[in-house]
Amino acid sequence: MTIAIGKSEQKRGLFDVADDWLRRDRFVFVGWSGLLLLPCAYFALGGWLTGTTFVTSWYTHGLASSYLEGCNFLTAAVSTPPNCMGHSLLLLWGPEAQSDFTRWCQLGGLWTFVALHGSFGLIGFMLRQFEIARAVKIRPYNAIAFSGPIAVFVSVFLIYPLGQAGWFFAPSFGVAAIFRFILFFQGFHNWTLNPFHMMGVAGILGAALLCAIHGATVENTLFEDGDGANTFRAFNPTQAEETYSMVTANRFWSQIFGVAFSNKRWLHFFMLFVPVTGLWMSALGVVGLALNLRAYDFVSQEIRAAEDPEFETFYTKNNLLNEGIRAWMAAQDQPHERLVFPEEVLPRGNAL
């Protein structure tokens, strides 16, 4: 006689069922992060496509900004709310739009909709990288690297306008609109002479250089022991051996520069560190601009240029350009302020 003794199956809660379904191995992983990422990305992209296709910026900026009005991909945009709206979230059911969708679009409600859903969508994408890295048991450096673009997006589209008078001063979501915002940053904040911008440029361009050098070096030192017709068929994806020779690469760059990375860990960490640090420095600089912190000022050159008509430097010439940007842009962008600049404040020659 055989007696089978077993434990009764524990009752599974709703959380366990949801966890199993969300983290199931499927073609497109959903995960808990997907609950944030997927709806937010859908709404942000949908709001942007809706705005650039149908919605005018006549009521907020006095501009045409949609395909319906004759714009193209480079000139269409979802524009920021008008200056009078301040930092209102412009909820569809709020006191401004009062659940009127047309009025909500006219007031710039799509911009806050896209900005907020876009921010949470980017955060959801970073959490997705954390979640999948944990599931497949690898380090989470991809997610850490993606914090750089998130920091830049949040600082430019949310923190900067929060430090200014309203969402009006944030960039609109469009190609030409972003270019105009860059000119605005230069004219009103002298952004190119800001040390944080300099660090950001060094990080991004330095990363591009590192990426090009690294890719070329790996291609140059591939082992030719495969039978395939090209690089992509020559190796088994699960091979145990190295694909390229680090020793040969080290010898090459030692001869070129006199120094070279001695191991792959330091090399690849450096390639991670340079662009991410550049992005974070840029984000910190924009946070400073939100508080109206100034860039470098070389006052001695300004005073001498004002006193001596024959003295000029590239710095003083750029200052005149910035003054011109401010004089033209302020009156154009803020007609409601009725800004009238007297002749003596407009740029003339090299007199500051």
UniProtKB/Swiss-Prot annotation:
The D1/D2 heterodimer binds P680, chlorophylls that are the primary electron donor of PSII, and subsequent electron acceptors. It shares a non-heme iron and each subunit binds pheophytin, quinone, additional chlorophylls, carotenoids and lipids. There is also a Cl(-1) ion associated with D1 and D2, which is required for oxygen evolution. The PSII complex binds additional chlorophylls, carotenoids and specific lipids. A plastoquinone binds at H214, F261. Fe cation binds at H214, H268. One of its GO terms (biological process) is photosynthetic electron transport in photosystem II. The keyword Electron transport applies. Chlorophyll a ChlzD2 binds at H117. It catalyses: 2 a plastoquinone + 4 hnu + 2 H2O = 2 a plastoquinol + O2. One of its GO terms (molecular function) is chlorophyll binding. The modification N-acetylthreonine is found at T2. Keywords: Acetylation, Chlorophyll, Chloroplast, Chromophore, Electron transport, Iron, Magnesium, Membrane, Metal-binding, Oxidoreductase, Phosphoprotein, Photosynthesis, Photosystem II, Plastid, Thylakoid, Transmembrane, Transmembrane helix, Transport. It is an enzyme of class 1 (oxidoreductase). It is a multi-pass membrane protein. The keyword Thylakoid applies. The modification Phosphothreonine is found at T2. GO terms for cellular component: chloroplast thylakoid membrane; photosystem II. Its EC number is 1.10.3.9. It holds the Pfam family Photo_RC. It is found in: Plastid, Chloroplast thylakoid membrane. PSII is composed of 1 copy each of membrane proteins PsbA, PsbB, PsbC, PsbD, PsbE, PsbF, PsbH, PsbI, PsbJ, PsbK, PsbL, PsbM, PsbT, PsbX, PsbY, PsbZ, Psb30/Ycf12, at least 3 peripheral proteins of the oxygen-evolving complex and a large number of cofactors. It forms dimeric complexes. Belongs to the reaction center PufL/M/PsbA/D family. 2 of the reaction center chlorophylls (ChlD1 and ChlD2) are entirely coordinated by water. Photosystem II (PSII) is a light-driven water:plastoquinone oxidoreductase that uses light energy to abstract electrons from H(2)O, generating O(2) and a proton gradient subsequently used for ATP formation. It consists of a core antenna complex that captures photons, and an electron transfer chain that converts photonic excitation into a charge separation. The D1/D2 (PsbA/PsbD) reaction center heterodimer binds P680, the primary electron donor of PSII as well as several subsequent electron acceptors. D2 is needed for assembly of a stable PSII complex. This is Photosystem II D2 protein. It comes from Tupiella akineta. The gene is psbD.
